[in-house]
């Protein structure tokens, strides 16, 4: 659909998930606010280490404070539903042989790689309905989800990062060094939640 309908808004979903009724309206509202960005109801914050990316397990998905503006360090997660704006999808998105050999089971990462190439940011859209998508069927120990979390995503992300460094060195430098490391990210999180606690305390004090 992303290739066939390049000049249209495209919303993608997982076919084994039951979604909240507000899913489409949430994504369309995100698009209306920032029509140049990808809108996603689930995202992860990509973090870096000194010589590479932080483990996928540490890419935080609790990102309420980052839901205001589109960012290049967010990775859209397809299971939550994703809205792609018209156009701005180059041919590299659809290189099927490369996609299958590098990211056959990690389409979220393949798409993020191409979003970096095409300078497309991601907007985290806070779901109107807080209930998470309900996956149909059981997730076993040998499932694709478990395989990706336990190293599959890390290998794919490292391969794509090296591909970016080789193909677009200046773009790689700009994007990679714009990422936060774990300590920087943790400090921002602490400051955010400390401010919430102070605000709630002040409200109670004034009552």
Describe these PLM feature segments.
Residues 2, 18-97:
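Conserved catalytic core of nucleotide-sugar-dependent glycosyltransferases
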Residues 1-9:
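Active-site nucleotide-sugar/metal-binding loop of Leloir-type enzymes
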Residues 7, 34-37, 120:
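Short, high-confidence coil segments that cap the C-terminus of an alpha-helix
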Residues 96-206:
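C-terminal catalytic/acceptor-binding lobe
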Residues 1, 84, 89, 111-115, ...:
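Structural element of the ATP-grasp superfamily
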């Amino acid at each position: 659909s992303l290739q066939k309908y390049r000049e249209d808004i495209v919303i993608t979903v997982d076919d084994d998930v039951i979604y909240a009724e507000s899913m489409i309206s949430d994504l369309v509202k995100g698009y209306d606010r920032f029509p140049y960005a990808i809108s996603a109801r689930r995202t992860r914050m990509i973090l870096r280490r000194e010589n590479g990316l932080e483990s996928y397990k540490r890419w935080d998905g609790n990102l309420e404070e980052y839901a205001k503006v589109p960012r290049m360090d967010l990775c859209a997660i397809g299971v939550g539903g994703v809205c792609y704006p018209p156009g701005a999808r180059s041919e590299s998105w659809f290189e099927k042989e490369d996609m299958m050999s590098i990211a056959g089971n990690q389409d979220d990462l393949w798409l993020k790689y191409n979003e970096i190439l095409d300078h497309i940011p991601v907007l985290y859209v806070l779901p109107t309905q807080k209930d998470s998508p309900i996956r149909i069927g059981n997730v076993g120990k040998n499932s694709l989800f478990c395989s990706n979390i336990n190293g599959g995503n890390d290998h794919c992300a490292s391969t794509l990062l090296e591909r970016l460094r080789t193909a677009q060195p200046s773009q790689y430098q700009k994007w990679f060094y714009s990422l936060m490391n774990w300590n920087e990210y943790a400090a921002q999180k602490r400051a955010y939640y400390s401010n919430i606690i102070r605000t709630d305390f002040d409200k109670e004090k004034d009552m």
